[in-house]
Structures are given as structure tokens and as C-alpha cells.
Amino acid sequence: IMGPCAGGAVYSPAMTDFIFMVKDTSYMFVTGPEVVKTVTNETVTSEELGGASIHTSKSSVADGGYENDLEALLQIRRLIDFLPSNNVDGVPTWPTFDDKERYDHSLDTLVPDNPNKPYDMKELIIKTVDEGDFFEIQENFAKNIICGFGRMDGSTVGIVANQPLILAGVLDSDASRKAARFVRFCNAFNIPI
């Protein structure tokens, strides 16, 4: 979404697999701030009502919010590089420059022996995917679970992982919905998880 999307037009993006928004310039709502003021006598801004910050962190309607149009387009291209052309084609394979025999000694201590001690699962993911390239989906929503795309041996994989640093990685309703939606997408496009 680049710019305002209001009224009936807002239903179309909701039916897509991924929605990206531009911070402070894109808005998505059925009814704008003026109508809200008239009906409820509450004053809200377009950003508070349906901006990128709301849809990426609270409603989970958008999968990513970016600083400007160019960054949004670059991130969309990056996502497309991970995805098959359609639900029949296999996952794309890219050449990797990682040494097949690489060994990261920091992985020996990243996960603590004490199961009650938190650690950063995102750090573990980045250290295990090809070239540390991980594309996270809904990074600012339900942070207690991580969903995104990476590559292993050049092939796209979907990654779902609890994040022990946030709420001890517990699966609450938001995290469960986020993970289920991501798993459903991966299943529809034959992306291994």
C-alpha cells in the first residue's frame, strides 16, 4: 500500500497473501478520520486509525512497514526472490557462497544449558540460513514467534520458531494465528518448513 486505501478498496488488499505499507504515507481503513470524528466525536489521525504502525503491530493486517516507497519496493523484490512463481512450481534455488563445511562455534553456546534462560532465536536463525539472509514476516506483531523465509543449501525454506526473549516464546492467540497463517501459505506454495 503506497498512499491511502479507503472505503471498498480496502477489501482487496486484505485478500492478498502479503501486504506491505509505507510509514506515514500509507493508510488502510474503511472509514476515514473525518467520519470517525462525526460519528463518535473522537479525534484520530489517519496514522492512528489505519497507518503502517497500527497494521504491522496491532491488527496484523500488514506484513511489513517501511520508511519510504523505494525501501518498500526493494523489500517486495526481496520477498519475491524467496517465493516460487506459483503454487505448482518448486521453490527457487539460488547459488550460495557459504562453505558447505562451515562451522559456527558460537552455536555451541548460543542456546544455554539452563532451559529457563532466554536466548535470541533470531540470532540462531541468521547463523543457520544461507549467508545470514532471513526475511521476517510480521516482525512487529506477536514477537514471541518468528516467521519468515530463508535458504538452506540454496533452496527456500519457511521458518517458524518461538522467540524465548519475548514472553518466553509462549504461544498465545496472536502468535498462534500468525504462525498458522504463515504455515498455511508455505503449504499452499509447497515451501518446506
Model feature map: region roles:
Residues 1-88, 191:
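Conserved catalytic cores of soluble enzyme domains
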Residues 33-35, 40-44, 49, 54, ...:
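Short capping/connector residues at structural and topological boundaries
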Residues 117-193:
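Non-catalytic terminal/interface segments that mediate subunit docking, oligomerization
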Residues 38-44, 60-67, 110-119, 164-171:
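Short, exposed beta-strand "edge-strand" segments with a Pro/Gly-rich flavor and a Y/T-containing core
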Residues 18-20, 109-112, 159:
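Short acidic/polar alpha-helix capping motifs at helix-coil junctions
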